[in-house]
C-alpha cells in the first residue's frame, strides 16, 4: 500500500502513512480516545465530503474554516503582506482546504511563510505546503515528532523571525513545543492553546483559562504558567487568537492578570471571568 494522507475522524490530525494503526494526538492524555474505535479518512473522502469558507477578519487578516466540522475544527489564519515583505504568513491551518478555499488563498497572494503553534493547530498544513511550496515551514523543535504529514524546513529553538515584526516565541507547557506568533504591527498574539477562550453565541469572550489538557481539566504547573508569563510580559498586543477563537477583548495586561491569578493559587483549572 503506498503512502498517503489520512485524517483521524476523531480529532482531525493528519498522518502520511500506509494505514495508520492509531492517532498520536488521541492517544496522548490531552485528547479523548474515540468511543467507537479508530477510523481514518483517506484524503479523497475528506475532499468529497467537506467544503469551507474564507472570512476577512481585518484589512490584513483572513480566517479559513472547514465545513462540516472535521476533528477539532480549528481555524487557519492568513496575515496578508506584500511580496516585498516576504509574502503572506499562514499560521495554523484549517482541517482541510477545498478547491475554492485554495483559490482564495491564491487570489490573496499565496503563502510565503507557514507555521503553527502545536499539533492541535496543524490542520492540513501538508496541503498548504503541497499547493504553495513556501520556503519556510516553521515548527518548534520539541514538537517535530508530530510532523510526519509535512516537511519542516525551519525548526527553531526559542524564537524565529518570519519577517520584520512577526516573531515566533517558544512557550511550551500545553505541548513541549508550543509556540506563539506575535504580530507587532497589528498588536496581535496568535497564542496557540496558551489560553482557552469561552465565548457566547454572539462571539463575545466571557471566560479565559489555561490548561495542560482541556478535555481532562488537567492544570498547568506554576513553572509552566511562569513560562507563559515570561513570554507575554515582553510583548505588546491588544488581542489574542487561538486555533479556535478570536478574542479582541484579551490584551497583554489582561493576559498577565489571568496568569498572575493562576499563579496565586494552587495548580487548578479556573475560568477567569471577563
Please give the residue ranges for each predicted region.
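Conserved beta-strand hairpin/beta-sheet module of binuclear metal-dependent hydrolase folds
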Residues: 50-101, 179-193
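Structural signal for conserved beta-strand scaffold positions within catalytic alpha/beta enzyme cores
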Residues: 63, 116, 138-139, 154-155, ...
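Metallo-beta-lactamase
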Residues: 2-22, 28-32, 45-59, 88-97, 126-273
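N-terminal juxtadomain amphipathic helix
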Residues: 2-66
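A general structural motif
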Residues: 86, 110-111, 134, 236-238
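Short glycine-/acidic-enriched loop or helix-start segments at secondary-structure transitions
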Residues: 73, 101-102, 125-126, 200-201, ...
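Active-site metal-binding motif and surrounding structural segment of the metallo-beta-lactamase
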Residues: 98-142
Amino acid at each position: 500500500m503506498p503512502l498517503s494522507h489520512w485524517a483521524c475522524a476523531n480529532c482531525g490530525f493528519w498522518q502520511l502513512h500506509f494505514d495508520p494503526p492509531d492517532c498520536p494526538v488521541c492517544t496522548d492524555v490531552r485528547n479523548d480516545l474515540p468511543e467507537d474505535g479508530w477510523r481514518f479518512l483517506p484524503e479523497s473522502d475528506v475532499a468529497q465530503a467537506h467544503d469551507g469558507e474564507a472570512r476577512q477578519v481585518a484589512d490584513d487578516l483572513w480566517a479559513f474554516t472547514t465545513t462540516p466540522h472535521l476533528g477539532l475544527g480549528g481555524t487557519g489564519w492568513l496575515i496578508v503582506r506584500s511580496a516585498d515583505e516576504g509574502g503572506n504568513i499562514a499560521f495554523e491551518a484549517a482541517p482541510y482546504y477545498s478547491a475554492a478555499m485554495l483559490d482564495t488563498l491564491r487570489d490573496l497572494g499565496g503563502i510565503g511563510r507557514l507555521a503553527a503553534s502545536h499539533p492541535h493547530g496543524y490542520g492540513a498544513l501538508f496541503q498548504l505546503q503541497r499547493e504553495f511550496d513556501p520556503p519556510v515551514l516553521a515548527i518548534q523543535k520539541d514538537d517535530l515528532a508530530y510532523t510526519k504529514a509535512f516537511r519542516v524546513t525551519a525548526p527553531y529553538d526559542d524564537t524565529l523571525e518570519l519577517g520584520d515584526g512577526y516573531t515566533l516565541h517558544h512557550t511550551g507547557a500545553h505541548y513541549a513545543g508550543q509556540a506563539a506568533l506575535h504580530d507587532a504591527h497589528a498588536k496581535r498574539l496568535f497564542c496557540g492553546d496558551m489560553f482557552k477562550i469561552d465565548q457566547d453565541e454572539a462571539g463575545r469572550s466571557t471566560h479565559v483559562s489555561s490548561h495542560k489538557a482541556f478535555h481532562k481539566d488537567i492544570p498547568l504547573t506554576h513553572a509552566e504558567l511562569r513560562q507563559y508569563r515570561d513570554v507575554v510580559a515582553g510583548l505588546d498586543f491588544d488581542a489574542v487568537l487561538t486555533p479556535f477563537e478570536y478574542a479582541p477583548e484579551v490584551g497583554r495586561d489582561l493576559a498577565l492578570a489571568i496568569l498572575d491569578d493562576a499563579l496565586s493559587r494552587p495548580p487548578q483549572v479556573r475560568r477567569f471571568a471577563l
